Amino acid sequence: MFLARALHAVVLLSTVADGAAMKIPRSSSGAQKLTYSHYGPVPGESPLYSTYRGKTPPFPANITDPILPTRKGKPGVDDMVWQNLLSAEWAIFSFYQQGVETFNKTSFVEAGYPNTTYDRIQEIRDNEAGHLRIFQDQISDTSLKPGACKYQYPFNDPESFLVLSTFIEIASMTFLTGLVQMAKLPTSQGAMTAIAAVETRHEVWSLMDIWNVNPFSGPSDTVFPYANQILDLTNVSS
């Protein structure tokens, strides 16, 4: 519960519509194009999700509306897990995107951090954009694919941003390993494990390059068994 409360303190969600609007998701023609898995750059095939450098959000984060179901039928076996994860990923991506927009290379150098820090933050932002696309594709066409909310984060300088970044990466790894236990399909479990490995790399970079601490903490990381307690905090309509 401490982890859940702490993440709630990090991610302060503001309402983006009145109650009636929250019950009736609004989409757009641009968002509905995301139904097709090969629309736009494909994770694993496009370098966009590692090498993009720019202040504006990369695809698919430049399209923030929810994706409405395109056919009727029962939801996929793991749709709810992926929906919760996609909601959380929007919050995580938005954190890094705000960092990219707020700071620049000089901001971190003048604060005493390595001159590669801003570039690495952009790369992590790109990775998180790729996660958005992966999670969208994992949700079946019979289920809603969540869009973004508006997010506020308690950082006001490079140091407070990096502190929050480290915590978010630790929390991400923890609830992802917990979600693996909730997924029923082996393909879902494998995809979540692969994403958790990427989040761990982000965490290790932060611990070693930013804080100069030993990233080795034992033979196993923490598995948070109630991952939805964390993810539910990212759902503004709950």
PLM features per residue range, with description:
Residues 1-29:
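Fungal secretory targeting signals
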Residues 22-238:
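All-alpha RGS (Regulator of G-protein Signaling) helical domain and cognate RGS-like helical scaffolds
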